[in-house]
């Protein structure tokens, strides 16, 4: 089977499923052959060997079963860098890059040196923050050992073992004193309908409880109890009112921000007592 024939066959199946058949078939075949997409067109009549053909259509089959393409490739781009991902971590989203930018603004303005992240996942947030600010040390936690293994690989990939430290724990149990807490926690309500491909991601990283904001409220209460001066979190589009009340109750002045689609997506909080 030629490259052209393989692409056309895969494109047809993927398009019928509602995926971007042309693009995704090229990405997957390029991944198998370790070639750029343009190569597939300039060498359209090259023959695939048996192993290449079998590997390609196995990936297509998994994609047709709603496996996210990032898991098939084992990578995802975030904040201009490529991160290792697998089925044990949430796939980094473009809107979370806004959280990184908001956190960096605070870190720069107040010259912060020690911060923390709850729910580190792939470590894309902690790694991005550390690379953008070379003087920063980050302590990051996750409840999932499998997620921490992924995070560790990304920290090693970017040579950050001396500045990003991992620990398996619930929220911030037995963790160091920090100046700022950053988190993109699970915030989807348990009954909320999601696409099949999203449901392939770890449910512990998606669902935040019956209403969805329960873990976020835990984090806010925790930050207030530990008197952490700054708090930056991603949240659900419909959680502004409840979280604003929680932040005010806990003594935080908060500024909320929107995502690229115009939905409420997160906040940066400053402890009022810190500003006095």
Identify the residue ranges that each predicted region occupies.
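Conserved Class I SAM-dependent methyltransferase catalytic core
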Residues: 211-269
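Mobile active-site "lid"/loop adjacent to the S-adenosyl-L-methionine
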Residues: 187-215
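Conserved AdoMet
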Residues: 31-105
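Conserved SAM/SAH cofactor-binding pocket of Class I
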Residues: 97-191, 218-221
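Flexible, glycine-/basic-rich loop-and-beta segments that form/coincide
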Residues: 272-276
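Active-site beta-alpha loop architecture of Rossmann-like, nucleotide-cofactor-dependent enzymes
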Residues: 70, 188, 238
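Non-catalytic accessory regions of SAM-dependent methyltransferases
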Residues: 1-33, 41, 45
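Conserved SAM-binding loop
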Residues: 140, 208, 232
């Amino acid at each position: 089977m030629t490259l052209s024939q393989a692409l056309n066959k895969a494109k047809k199946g993927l398009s019928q499923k509602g995926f971007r058949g042309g693009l995704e078939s090229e990405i997957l075949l390029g991944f198998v052959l370790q070639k750029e997409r343009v190569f597939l067109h300039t060498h359209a009549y090259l023959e695939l060997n048996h192993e290449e053909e079998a590997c390609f259509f196995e990936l297509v089959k998994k994609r047709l079963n709603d496996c996210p393409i990032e898991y098939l490739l084992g990578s995802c781009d975030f904040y201009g860098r490529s991160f290792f991902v697998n089925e044990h971590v949430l796939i980094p989203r473009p809107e979370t890059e806004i959280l990184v930018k908001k956190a960096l603004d605070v870190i720069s303005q107040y010259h912060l040196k020690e911060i923390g992240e709850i729910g580190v996942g792939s470590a894309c947030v902690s790694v991005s923050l550390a690379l953008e600010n070379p003087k920063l040390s980050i302590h990051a936690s996750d409840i999932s050992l499998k997620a921490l293994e992924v995070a560790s690989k990304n920290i090693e990939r970017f040579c950050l073992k001396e500045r990003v430290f991992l620990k398996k724990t619930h929220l911030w149990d037995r963790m160091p004193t920090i100046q700022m807490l950053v988190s993109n926690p699970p915030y989807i309500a348990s009954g909320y309908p999601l696409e099949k491909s999203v449901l392939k991601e770890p449910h512990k990283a998606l669902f935040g409880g019956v209403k969805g904001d329960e873990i976020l409220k835990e984090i806010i209460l925790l930050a207030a109890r530990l008197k952490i001066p700054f708090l930056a979190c991603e949240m659900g589009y419909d959680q502004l009112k409840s979280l604003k009340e929680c932040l005010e109750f806990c003594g935080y002045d908060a500024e909320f921000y929107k995502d690229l689609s115009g939905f409420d997506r997160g906040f940066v909080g400053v402890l009022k007592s810190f500003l006095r």
